[in-house]
Design a protein with these regions (language model features):
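A cytosolic small-molecule/anion-sensing beta-strand core signal
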Residues: 140
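N-terminal lobe of the biotin/lipoate ligase/transferase fold
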Residues: 1-130, 148-157, 161
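Conserved small/polar residues in nucleotide/adenosyl-binding loops
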Residues: 166
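FAD-binding subdomain of flavoenzyme oxidoreductases
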Residues: 137
Length: 166
């Protein structure tokens, strides 16, 4: 992920070659669906797209038509958003970009919704640490960090936002 400049591209001075040799194979949508969607599970559907502006924006626009637990995954994000509406871009296959639709309704009081970012961050940090065997940390309020060569680097972020839908 790189912060975008005013033109929406990579920041000035960013090394273009840094992102030019990403060799991760494309995501296997069918395998993700088999692994994540099942009776009694948390996720109702998984959709993988090659590119999008923002998975959050796309999922929010369709929230009224989708069931709770819908997951949208993108190989590339061109208009990612973070806290305080900060924008960033992420070239194809440079990371994992996804959004999950939750519909807590009356089962979770609204005053508790603010905990979602922290809870998701703890879960993500634990998952990355266990799966990759790396030290992870959370930087308040929503950044996921890993240690690389003695330096903490941002490896992800959590953005939870309420959406009105009918």
């Amino acid at each position: 992920m790189t912060p975008s400049d005013a033109s929406g591209g990579a920041p000035s001075g960013a090394a273009a070659g840094r992102w030019s040799s990403l060799d991760r194979p494309p995501l296997n949508a069918a395998a993700l669906e088999r692994a994540l969607v099942g009776d009694g599970g948390l996720w109702s559907s998984v959709e993988v797209v090659a590119a999008t502006g923002s998975t959050n924006t796309d999922l929010a626009a369709r929230a009224g038509q989708l069931p709770e637990g819908a997951v949208l995954v993108a190989e590339e994000q061109t208009a990612g958003r973070g806290r305080l509406d900060r924008s960033w871009v992420a070239p194809a296959r440079s990371g994992l970009f996804f959004s999950v639709l939750l519909k807590p309704g009356d089962s979770v009081p609204q005053e508790r919704w603010g905990w979602l970012t922290l809870l998701a961050g703890v879960a993500a940090a634990t998952g990355v640490s266990r799966a990759a065997g790396v030290d992870t940390a959370l930087k308040w309020p929503n950044d996921l960090l890993i240690t690389v060569e003695g330096e903490e680097r941002k490896t992800g972020g959590i953005l939870a936002e309420p959406v009105s839908y009918t």
